[in-house]
């Protein structure tokens, strides 16, 4: 009886977490002032949002019913919140998942950010298996890519258990020994990922080492 009750509680918790996940995504995809830059050079402006399937729904005016655009024909989008425009690009993780990522730095190594507010991934309490649960703090994932590569890799995360930053960063930036040395000496920690990428793009003696800052956070 206790085991059945325990299983029921786990299922209830998982269902509640998934429901919360859905509403969190919905809340994070409200319509905003949006500008779409297509691969062919076309630019459209209006109000838009990122849909659950990653397409962009854009309304050109109040009378427009809106059109869904395939993310694969879009170079980037700009979403304006509280008068501040942020650039997002559609990328593919090494594990195959696709998502829109906020652009922080573009250069020889580009840095991207993905916020997951209100929920977390980890071990569900009392269940013995991993899944999604509530979180009191937001989780932020940071991704890196070589230049404009479509595929990105997680370099670190904040607010959640992440990869060994020292090992991951040392491997990714192995062509810059001075940076690896700073990471291993803990001069740069995972909280400093912005400075790490900026250092690599501007200080390391590698080809095309330039850095364009798109956002500080």
Language model features with spans:
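Bacterial Sec-dependent N-terminal signal peptides
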Residues: 1-32
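Aromatic-patch recognition
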Residues: 37-39, 44-179
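C-terminal partner/receptor-binding element of secreted or periplasmic proteins
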Residues: 174-217
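Sec-dependent signal peptide cleavage junction
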Residues: 28-45, 51, 193-194, 205-217
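A general boundary/transition motif marking the beginning of the first structured unit of a protein
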Residues: 2-4, 157, 184-188
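Alpha-helix boundary/interfacial micro-motifs
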Residues: 22-23, 28, 57-58, 208-209
